[in-house]
Amino acid sequence: MNIFSPLPEFVMFRCCLFIAILLNLTNADSKAEFPNVAPPTAELVASFQLDTFYTKHVSVKGFPVLGSAKVSDVALQEAAYLIDQMLGGREDIYVALIDSKTRFAIMAPDEFTTEIPAHSDLTPKTFWDRRARGLGATPARPAVSCGEENLLCLRGDPYHEENILVHEFAHAIHDMGLARIDGKFDDRLQAIYDQAIQEGLWNGKYAANNHHEYWAEGVQSYFGTNRLPDHDHNHVDTRDKLKEYDPRLFALIDEVFRGNPWQYTRPEHRRELPHLRGWDAEDLSSFSWPEHLLREGAKQKRDREQAAIENE
């Protein structure tokens, strides 16, 4: 038989069809249509009791990502993308977050923490507006928040070395998601946190503050978006380093996210994705602290330094 003879027509058709299916599956992520940005629906407003502050939203499997008119559409879609990457394969956590009326709120570069309706009762306002460019959700305040400048890596982002959404959404997964679907999770987390502290792990670092921050900092490293070593962080900033340094925390996180291989990369390295095509950070506003919050920041620094001296 001549191996170079033309294949029968039906065989050629099946081969071409198989190749087309493979190409379609391979390129599914890059060609997928992304959720449209639209005003919150009347049903969503009623169900989540949303404030009129929110004029835009994107839905991720029914979970709302919200912003005011000042927030860019691409920021909403970027947040939706990151949330979906983190929770791939965990539809049950989506359901728990929606049932608990959790929502994700984005601050524009010239908006601040206490402008988010769920956080508007935090006082003193200047303290919180300078203290945080993102907060986790609690039953009393069911909004996870983050600044647009961090989502899109805009100029002036004070947290440019890490992704704040991953950290704050990790808190929501813990407190508003897993708390509803796994009654043993918090106790398990507390136990491995206690063991880590007893062994001297994370000594003097932000992850040592409590089991909530231990979890959120671990999730950041698991997804490859933690800070380089500084006064609040040690060398653990990747999945491999986390597995080596604190294997118990790694194992729990890996169990929750079911071995999710996704790793965070900055948006400028993902321009092929539908929501980032044609996007340019230079077209958007940069971030800067207003003068009154710079003064507040200096005061908070002095207070921390004084407290450290008193605790010596």
Segments from the language model and where they lie:
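Boundary at the C-terminal end of the N-terminal hydrophobic targeting segment
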Residues: A28-A32
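Acidic/His-rich structured neighborhood in mature extracellular/periplasmic domains
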Residues: V45, D51-F53, V60-F63, V71-G200, ...
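Ser/Thr/Asn(+Pro)-rich, low-complexity disordered segments
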Residues: L50, K56-H57, R188-I192, K301-E312
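N-terminal secretory signal peptides that target proteins for export/translocation
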Residues: M1-M12
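Bacterial N-terminal signal peptides
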Residues: C15-N24
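A structural signal for well-ordered alpha-helical segments within the folded catalytic domains
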Residues: Q77, Y81, N163-H167, N210-S221, ...
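An amphipathic alpha-helical core segment
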Residues: D186-Y245
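Pan-zinc metallopeptidase signature
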Residues: V219-E312
